[in-house]
């Protein structure tokens, strides 16, 4: 099992070398590069990766073009260029609720993972404030909503697929039910049925919403939304109760946010290059009890951190090209032709991501640098190959080693890799015209013939692969005892007879030596 970090840059239309940039997928724990995608650049939040490994896809919205580039894992050049109704600024994918677990844990299934597979829905936001929703397996345009007045900066689905959340430059954040967005085959031909309202409209911010994140709860009642804005605020909402829980006020504008997988803290990237940790729990000094911070619409001002207990500083280090007192690490990261142009520009932490176990923080900035930091020590543990423009997306995913390594004999015919062309007009309401392109997987094994011992052994091996962070699979080999009880008894009897014989000989020898010793003493007397 390995964790792969995917990152991509925004690109610069004024830079002729911008098209030479690569989007990369690299391991967190070792130096292996899993995949690279040529001529890939996207607006902030304008790229999305369906997963890591053979059969997965990268979907990129072309900057300032009504075009969508689709890459296959293991191929550097795009497979498809799909025209769109208008240029998109952000993208989001979601798996179907009934197939999500099958896709993630296919090794435990009685069917093999199909070579052709696509997510369920693709959502995109545009500069005009519209939200588009496509069904990828058919290419049907299910919904177009005029959700905002200005550019949509970010769209995200909840992990369960129940809600779609969008943030915009108009300082609003809207929450939509996914079923409302895709309810086109309900048999009602009235156009007013499409004019539904959002599940929740958030208007608490005063400036543009730059980023948002949803937690991954075990039950939907614990679903929370974290939004950040250029008005220096981090706001936490309960989606089910539609209540604002806590507002954190910081000293700088916030550009990015990520939440701890266990809900212990939130990490925000600021416009001055700092990353602040905002703990959601603390220990009461009077009772020594762990208590939650905030709630009940509290407004909390985050104080400065002079001791740097909750602050990451590495993005603030700006090194000039002719500096001599710098480390080799930062020389490599800042070896660009436009160092002098960027010298007076502030450094923004544009994107944040967190590892599966919540121990490593991955961050990208406006200079194209990407770091992996240890959350406990707040020190940089790894750096990736820098890009020549601001980082627009960082995504972390996990997969087995054999899935990440693409072999030459695992290539699929191009026509079987392509997804359907995305429609530019709304689909009709006739359900009989709804056609899907799906691959029915073949059976991998018969679970009914598997006994408990084999199942337990397989689970033990899967647990070992999950905990193994290297590319070497090692385990202690157990040698079975193939001897029978009668053979063991005979072997023990032979050993006992040999020991008895040796003891008898040793005792007789001792008696002889004792007699000789007595004779010598008598002769001397």
UniProtKB/Swiss-Prot annotation:
What are the entry keywords? Nucleus, Repeat, Ribosome biogenesis, rRNA processing, WD repeat
Q: Start-end of the WD repeats?
A: 105-144, 147-186, 204-247, 326-374
Record's protein name: Pre-rRNA-processing protein IPI3
GO terms for biological process, alphabetical: DNA-templated DNA replication; rRNA processing
Q: How does it assemble?
A: Component of the RIX1 complex, composed of IPI1, RIX1/IPI2 and IPI3 in a 1:2:2 stoichiometry. The complex interacts (via RIX1) with MDN1 (via its hexameric AAA ATPase ring) and the pre-60S ribosome particles.
**Disulfide bond sites:** none
Specify one Pfam family. WD40
Gene Ontology cellular component?
Answer: nuclear pre-replicative complex; rixosome complex
The task this protein performs is described as: Component of the RIX1 complex required for processing of ITS2 sequences from 35S pre-rRNA.
Q: Family, per the entry? A: Belongs to the WD repeat IPI3/WDR18 family.
Compartments, record wording: Nucleus
- Main subcellular location: nucleus
SUPFAM superfamilies tied to this protein = WD40 repeat-like (SSF50978)
């Amino acid at each position: 099992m390995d964790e792969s970090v995917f990152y991509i840059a925004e690109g610069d239309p004024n830079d002729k070398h911008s098209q030479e940039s690569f989007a990369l997928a690299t391991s967190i724990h070792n130096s292996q590069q899993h995949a690279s995608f040529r001529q890939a650049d996207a607006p902030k939040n304008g790229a999305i990766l369906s997963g890591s490994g053979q059969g997965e896809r990268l979907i990129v919205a072309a900057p300032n073009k009504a075009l969508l580039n689709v890459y296959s894992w293991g191929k550097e050049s795009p497979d498809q260029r799909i025209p769109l109704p208008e240029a998109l600024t952000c993208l989001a994918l979601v798996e179907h609720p009934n197939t999500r677990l099958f896709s993630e844990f296919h090794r435990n299934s009685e069917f093999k993972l199909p070579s052709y597979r696509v997510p369920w829905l693709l959502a995109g936001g545009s500069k005009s404030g519209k939200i588009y929703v496509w069904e990828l397996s058919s290419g049907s345009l299910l919904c177009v909503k005029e959700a905002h007045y200005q550019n949509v900066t970010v769209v995200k689905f909840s992990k369960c697929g129940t809600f779609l959340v969008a943030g915009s430059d108009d300082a609003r954040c809207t929450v939509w039910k996914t079923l409302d967005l895709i309810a086109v085959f309900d048999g009602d031909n009235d156009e007013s049925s499409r004019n539904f309202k959002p599940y929740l409209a958030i208007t608490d911010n005063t400036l543009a919403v730059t980023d948002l994140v949803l937690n991954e709860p075990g039950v939907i009642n614990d679903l929370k939304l974290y939004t950040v804005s250029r008005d220096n605020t981090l706001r936490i909402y309960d989606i089910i109760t539609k209540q604002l829980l806590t507002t954190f006020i910081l000293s700088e504008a916030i550009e990015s946010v990520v939440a701890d997988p266990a809900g212990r803290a939130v990490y925000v990237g600021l416009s001055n290059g700092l990353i602040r940790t905002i703990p959601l729990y603390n220990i009461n000094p009077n009772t020594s009890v762990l208590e939650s911070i905030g709630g009940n619409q509290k407004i909390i001002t985050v104080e400065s951190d002079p001791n740097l207990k909750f602050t990451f500083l590495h993005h603030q280090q700006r090194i000039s090209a002719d500096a001599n007192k710098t480390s080799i690490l930062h020389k490599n990261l800042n070896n660009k032709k436009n160092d002098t142009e960027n010298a007076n520009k502030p450094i923004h932490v544009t994107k944040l991501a967190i590892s599966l176990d919540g121990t490593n923080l991955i961050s990208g900035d406006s200079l194209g640098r990407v770091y992996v930091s240890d959350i406990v020590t707040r020190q940089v543990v790894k750096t990736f190959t820098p890009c020549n423009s601001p980082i627009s997306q960082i995504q972390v995913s996990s997969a087995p080693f054999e899935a990440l390594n693409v072999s030459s004999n695992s290539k699929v015919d191009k026509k079987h890799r392509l997804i359907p062309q995305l429609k530019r007009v709304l689909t009709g309401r006739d359900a009989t015209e709804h056609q899907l392109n799906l691959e029915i997987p073949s059976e991998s094994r018969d679970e009914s013939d598997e006994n408990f011992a084999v199942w337990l052994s397989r689970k033990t091996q899967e647990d070992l692969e999950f905990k193994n962070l290297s590319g070497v699979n090692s385990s202690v080999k157990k040698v079975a005892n193939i001897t029978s009880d009668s053979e063991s008894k005979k072997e023990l009897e032979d050993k006992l007879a040999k020991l008895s014989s040796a003891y008898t000989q040793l005792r007789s020898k001792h008696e002889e030596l004792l007699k000789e010793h007595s004779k010598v003493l008598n002769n001397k007397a």
